[in-house]
């Protein structure tokens, strides 16, 4: 049971009412505060001021307030008009029934079904694009699309890196062929040199000096090439180290969540609660139906007296009354609601714990990989630098030895000894070819390193693609459920209302950019038709069904136990009754409006007789329209 106390909201200066489980019909003529009362309930549950809408503070009043008292809590929400600006803004304070943005948006779209409901308005205006935007709103509050977009960018970057590495791999055959060719040329040059040397007198000192000098020069060129290659390698590894250290420093790992055992325990508890809720629901529904229909005598003996009917309890056999059974049913209903709240809380906790665990594990793995790579790079750089120093020392020694050998060789040459010009040319070619071979081998090593980098990036790419697919499946699941709920609700509505069309379908379409859109299509006389062919009442009916599909898909009933229905004057009185009967089992509390000429309804009638509301004449004298009916 809800008690609602209203001050200066819409067209109600002051008023209060009690809402009970089941249908609650606010029945009155125009300008008696029907719609304003529903706006007050909206204010209390926290669904006003959303989607560029204003809070419903009474015009020319600076303050308004709504107090909602439930069986468990009391919620007070105040509205205040700022008076220090040219265009006064209305702000909200206090704690509404719903505090999370995600819950408020879902309730505004799918539980507050007044004439200004955004879903109904989009259907009424045949705005399929706006309808798509609104149906996707709850998933936006889960940040699914916001998480998909950066993932797609990361995947694109990784794909570009892999493609670049693939391009580098295309150079691999040419690099391998170049190394093989230079090795063959060097082998041929060495054979030619050996042949020429055999023709030279190997007994002369000049021969020995020449061989020694050539060997030293070859050693020097080889060491210089090694030094250049190592220095370049050190520079590359230092750059990689800086990148890895920067990435590690920017990596933020949240605190570890509860252990997996807690998640399993909570999931077990959720399953247990679901069983209990279903059992209580079956008991409540069947027992209430027997009591409401006055069919107690079907299952037990009823003793009818002037003071009231009594009968034997059909469970324990004790004597009881319908009022006592009804009171017990209310207690069962309260127990159901408590179990639903526990289940919703546990479900939210499990979802958050699982998501947090996945994020932490991913970041820990990333951190471990970065630390391993940093450690390896540091060791490699240290080893390279040690080798650089060793090579530099070797080069200094070789340069000194070459200077000495050149002086000795020049002295021997002056003594009349001469070298073969052809042999000198071959020896020079050997040194040049050895240098080219060293450089070709270095280039081959670089390309092979790029191929290894490609493999690493490919693994990262697969991980990101899996994560993206998980998010897309979550989104697809909700979208499919939305379509199924629409189809099921529309089938029920057609059976109850017999409208002038055969069926309505919520079609889901995905474009080349993986963007999902929704479109309502109708069937009439075996042909597909548009919303503009419907009557005003039929269009409102389709809008309400669309909102109800969202209500069930996004479990809005687990967030707020009520549905507010207003602005259904386009429906005939019998159709209003059908709508109330249809919605009665959808939410614990149903609040709707009706005119007196619609007749009487089953359920609780809420009368505005004692409310202080703005009169029709006062409303007409305002500069701006005010919610009063």
UniProtKB/Swiss-Prot annotation:
Coiled-coil regions listed: 139-282, 318-487
Induction remarks: Transcription is regulated in a cell cycle-dependent manner, with maximal expression around the time of septum formation.
InterPro entries: P-loop_NTPase
Keywords, comma-separated and alphabetical: Coiled coil, Cytoplasm
Keyword ATP-binding part of the UniProt annotation: no
Keyword NADP among UniProt keywords: no
Entry GO terms, CC: cytoplasm
Domain of life: Archaea
UniProt-annotated location(s): Cytoplasm
Role played: May play a role in a late step of replication.
Stated family: Belongs to the Sph1/Sph2 family.
Misc. remarks from the entry: Overexpression results in modifications of cell morphology from rods to extended rods.
Protein name: Smc-like protein Sph1
